[in-house]
Amino acid sequence: MPKLGMQSIRRRQLIDATLEAINEVGMHDATIAQIARRAGVSTGIISHYFRDKNGLLEATMRDITSQLRDAVLNRLHALPQGSAEQRLQAIVGGNFDETQVSSAAMKAWLAFWASSMHQPMLYRLQQVSSRRLLSNLVSEFRRELPRQQAQEAGYGLAALIDGLWLRAALSGKPLDKPLAHSLTRHFITQHLPTD
């Protein structure tokens, strides 16, 4: 008889082991056997919980996107009466949260984006994540700008966030958070009306 709560513990172990493997050898070279060894379980456990490597990658990406959503929402909930500028900075902060810019998370995101072009389930996850970011940004800009301007500003800020993140991921160096926040703050203030 399985121990109560063991499923969530095992899933967490396997997702963490997947992130470690992707960080060290890349998604394509990470094998089920390597991931199982890192997690201290048999390969059969992975099949039991996730079917196969694609199922495990999907669960890993769902976990990372969930962490992203939580990082953004926690910051927004702390600012219920915040200005549009403050709330836009909170969204930026969530996207540059440590859960999203650690070496393992960045490599997993890169692998996820590449795989999403060929795997329908990962593509759907990627689209949900991208739409959520754009929707959140446009919603906040919309508090101060007409619809078309808000959409353009939201799209531009999403591109800036993704671009800063991608440049850091491909550089192999940690994201320069002060610079990233300075650049995004400048973009935001350029697009919001002055008082």
UniProtKB/Swiss-Prot annotation:
PANTHER family in the cross-refs: HTH-TYPE TRANSCRIPTIONAL REGULATOR BETI (PTHR30055:SF234), HTH-TYPE TRANSCRIPTIONAL REGULATOR RUTR (PTHR30055)
InterPro entries: BetI_C (IPR039538), DNA-bd_HTH_TetR-type_CS (IPR023772), Homeodomain-like_sf (IPR009057), HTH-type_TetR-like_transc_reg (IPR050109), HTH_TetR (IPR001647), Tet_transcr_reg_TetR-rel_C_sf (IPR036271), Tscrpt_rep_BetI (IPR017757)
HAMAP family: HTH_type_BetI
Keywords: DNA-binding, Repressor, Transcription, Transcription regulation
A matching Pfam family: TetR_C_6
Domain HTH tetR-type as annotated: residue spans: 8-68
Designated gene of the protein: betI
UniProt pathway annotation: Amine and polyamine biosynthesis; betaine biosynthesis via choline pathway [regulation]
Gene Ontology MF annotations: DNA-binding transcription factor activity; transcription cis-regulatory region binding
Organism whose genome encodes this protein: Escherichia coli O139:H28 (strain E24377A / ETEC)
Source lineage: Bacteria, Pseudomonadati, Pseudomonadota, Gammaproteobacteria, Enterobacterales
Superkingdom of origin organism: Bacteria
Function recorded in the entry: Repressor involved in the biosynthesis of the osmoprotectant glycine betaine. It represses transcription of the choline transporter BetT and the genes of BetAB involved in the synthesis of glycine betaine.
Name under which the protein is recorded: HTH-type transcriptional regulator BetI
PROSITE patterns: HTH_TETR_1, HTH_TETR_2
Gene Ontology BP, a term: glycine betaine biosynthetic process from choline
Coiled-coil region(s): none
DNA-binding region ranges: 31-50
